[in-house]
Every structure is written in C-alpha cells, then in structure tokens.
Design a protein with these regions (language model features):
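Beta-strand-rich modules
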Residues: 108-125
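Pro/Thr/Ser/Gly-rich low-complexity, intrinsically disordered linker/stalk tracts
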Residues: 29-58, 127-136
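His/acidic metal-ligating clusters that form di-metal
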Residues: 175-184, 270, 283-388
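Extended active-site neighborhood of metal-dependent phosphoesterases/phosphodiesterases
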Residues: 197-303, 351, 357-358, 374, ...
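Active-site glycine-centered loops adjacent to acidic/histidine catalytic or metal-binding residues
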Residues: 151, 189-190, 219-220, 313, ...
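Sec-dependent signal peptide cleavage junction
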Residues: 19-30
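N-terminal active-site segment of His-dependent metallophosphoesterases
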Residues: 135-200
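Recognizes extended acidic, P/S/T-rich segments that occur
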Residues: 67-113
C-alpha cells in the first residue's frame, strides 16, 4: 500500500510541476502517436466484455477506450423522446514504458450495437479495432425496463443559496428514467435526512408526476427520531398497506413496510421491498427482526423459480478476505472504508447472508455507502458481484443526491451534491438483464459500469 501511495504522489507532483511549467512534458513523437488496443476476451459469451485490455504505444500516457460504431464514432443510444444518450469510456489504461494493461470486470457488458473498440488519447482517435462477430449480437426484443435509485436524501444537502439539492436531483433522475421508457422504479431507501415528514411529501410529489410505480424500502436515515409512520404510509408505497391495494401487490408483511410486487409491467418478475428497523450499526443490534426474516424466507421460497429483485438499504461485508472489499464498499489508498456495513456476525446478518447464498435467483439492490461507480478502481466488487457464483447477484446503487469519492489527495470520503447524481437504468430480456449505471447530471450512461446479469 505504501508503495502505491508513493507512486501516486510522485505522479501528482510531476503533473503539477508540468502544469506550472517547471517540468516540460514529454513531447509527442514527431511522427505522431502510434498506438494500438487489444481486448483479449476471457470467454466466448456474447455481449461479455470480460477480459484484459492491452494498449501499446510509442507515447506513455493515459488512454481512454470507448465502444464504437462501424463508422468509428463513439457509441450512443436514444431515449424514447429521441434524445441522444452517450456512453462514456468503458476503460482507462495507463501506458508506461510502451505498454499498459487493465483487467475488465467479469460482468462488464458490450452494449447492443457496439461494433468497434476506439482508443483515444485526449480527444484524438489513435486506433480502431473491430469486435469479433461472436461477441456482438442483437439483444433481441426487450421485455421491459426499470430504474433503481438510492439515497435520495431530501433535506440533507443544500446549495449556497440554501436550496435543497434533492429538489433538483431526484426529479431529474426520475425524468431521465421516464424518458428512457422505464415501467417501474425501485428505491433502496434513505429518502430523508432524519425521517422528517417533508422528505416523504416531496418524494410523493415527484413520483406522482409520472405514470409508473415508484416503490421503496426504509434506510437508516428513515429510522431516525423524526420518523412518523402515518406520514410514511400516506406518501410512500401509496396504497400498498391499505384495503385498496394496487394491482400486483402479492404479499404484505404485518410490520407495515415489507411487501412483494409483481404487476403486468414486470412480466412475471418479482420485486421485494425489505426495510430495516434501526439506524444503529452495532454488535447484537438487529437491522431486521426474526419475524421479518421469517417472512422474507417465505417469499424467497415461494418465488424461487422466478427472477426476484430484492431491495434493501444496507450492503453486506465480503464473505471472506478483506471484509471491506465486498459489494458496496471500497478500501482506499490509506486503508479507509465506509464504516457502517451490516454488522458481520450479528444474528440477523448471518441469516440474511444465508438467504442470499441459498436463493441465487435473486438480484439484490442496496445503497447506503453512496460510492460513485468510478470508485470501482479501488474494489472490483464495489458495483456488482456474486462472489464467483456462490451468492445472489449483489448490485450497488449509488446516490441520486450525493455520490461519494476518494483519491490519493482526498483520503476522507467526499460527498458531491449538485455536481454528481447517479443510479441505474436496467433493460430486461428473457434470459438476462443489462444494468446501466447512469450519470443523471450529464445525461449519459457510464460504460465502465454497464453489466450483464445472466438470470
């Protein structure tokens, strides 16, 4: 770790000295940059980008790699209203002494309509490689699409004028997902700062502007002192716990929070929303009750032959090795991490983990840490993992309000309200799901966090 920190600091110092003219940057060769990119695939599976990227060049620098069209243009897609939605780079590779490599996430997807790999130095296209025919294919007819959000946090982050940033970030996220044509949106909790009524009223107000259902569970901030159940029931998951339930509500728990939904728009897929009951992350303090876990186990057993999306707020530590290198967390240059995971070894945590190990048909959405998707550089499991096929597929949902970053010059986690806002747009097909991480501020898909889930 120390060597890594030293190398990063040296690189930063050199970059700074170059920027102020003390050190002259290495000039580009007189004949220009001559570079090539190669993706050595790890498997023959269509649409899987798993493998190793190798960039060779006569000029040492950082290069960006994009998916492209046959015409050599960066890949884009379109919203239902006709807006162009660009894909970002899917990898960055640093070339040193003429060569650089990057191992790609085993879940990384080749987007539909991608035909080439484009290598860029800054804004200059320096190489184009055609994807093998066996790796590109038309996904076929999409069954439906949906959105996943988390950590909305009304009343927590304010701009310099005193405006609640979530009054902008949340409706913008919903508008983006609506324009992409989603049929339903699931949220992994933390709608508020301290459980205050106004947060839930705002959440309901923006949801009511759209024709699709928006369902959620509770997060730790929704378990704080200002929480009032009647306000929650009136504004959140509206009607689910009434005598006049929305069509598609298959089961509700006696606790007034947890429920199962499978409507016409989900085409047989099952959505489960499962709420924690406390904001305390301590030994022997249960996030969920035994009765909740009994109920959850019953639902998972009932729908074990279905594709199930389980929404919960808090992520779990890795089952082995460094506990902070599991889905939902990172371990930065200084050994720092997000300090509030589901407390490993607690009675409820062990049972919950056991259920996620047994029912591998589940896709488990959780938020809580706010880590931005690019922080995958610190942990390949941050955004998605199934721990080599031993568990349900666990999927990190960043924050629509304030994604967090860290770096060599930013040892402590830094929140980015206003300048960043992220979430997921998911395309569902008969045999797989494509999970697209989204940058709602710039209206783009983060290609480095676009994944294929075979379920």
């Amino acid at each position: 770790m120390l060597a890594n920190i030293v190398n990063k600091f040296i690189a930063l110092i050199l970059a700074f000295l170059m920027s102020i003219g003390i050190i002259t940057p290495t000039p580009i060769p007189p004949g220009g940059i001559e570079a090539s990119v190669e993706l050595n695939f790890a498997n023959d599976e269509k649409a899987s980008a798993a493998g190793t990227l190798t960039v060779t060049s006569n000029y040492d620098a950082e290069y960006s790699v994009y998916w492209g069209t046959l015409g050599g243009e960066k890949l884009t897609t379109y919203s239902e209203s006709g807006k162009t939605v660009p894909y970002t780079e899917f990898a960055k590779v640093t070339v040193k002494d003429g060569e650089g490599e990057k191992e790609l996430n085993s879940f990384l997807a080749i987007p539909q309509n991608a035909k080439t790999i484009l290598l860029y130095y800054d804004d200059q296209l320096v190489d184009t490689e055609t994807l093998p025919l066996g790796k590109t294919f038309a996904y076929g007819a999409e069954t439906y699409s949906f959105g996943s959000l988390s950590d909305v946090h009304f009343n927590r982050y304010y701009d310099e004028a005193g405006n609640d940033i979530s009054q902008t970030s949340y409706p913008r996220a919903l508008n983006f997902l609506d324009d992409m044509g989603v049929s339903i949106v699931g949220v992994s909790g933390d709608l508020s700062k301290e459980g205050e009524d106004s947060a839930y009223v705002s959440f309901n107000k923006y949801n009511s502007e759209h024709d699709f259902n928006v369902f959620t569970c509770k997060g730790n901030h929704d378990c704080k002192d200002k929480f009032n159940y009647e306000t929650w029931k009136e504004n959140i998951n509206v009607g689910v716990f009434s005598d006049n339930k929305p069509d598609g509500v298959l089961a509700v728990s006696d606790n007034g929070y947890d429920f199962v939904y499978s409507g016409k728009e989900t085409h047989g897929d099952v959505f489960i929303f499962f709420s924690q009951i406390t904001d305390k992350y301590l030994p022997f303090v249960q996030l969920v009750t035994d009765e909740q876990l009994d109920w959850l186990e019953t639902q998972l057993e009932t729908y074990k032959d279905k594709r199930v999306y389980l929404y919960f707020h808090t992520f779990l530590n890795a089952p082995s090795g460094n506990p902070f290198l599991g889905e939902g967390n990172i371990y930065n240059d200084y050994g720092l991490f997000y300090i509030l995971p589901y407390f490993t070894g607690n009675k409820d945590e062990k049972r919950f983990r056991g259920l996620l190990t047994e029912y591998k048909n589940v896709i488990f959405f959780n938020g809580h840490s706010h880590w931005t998707y690019s922080m995958e550089e610190y942990n390949e499991n941050l955004n998605i993992t199934d721990y080599d096929g031993t568990t349900a597929t666990m999927v990190h949902v960043s924050s629509s309000a304030a994604p967090r970053t860290t770096s060599i010059t930013q040892p402590i986690q830094h929140s980015n309200p206003g300048t960043m806002s992220e979430g997921l747009y998911l395309n569902v097909y008969p045999d797989f799901v494509i999970s697209n991480a989204c940058d709602f501020v710039n209206g783009q898909i983060l290609a480095y966090a676009t994944y294929k889930i075979d379920k």
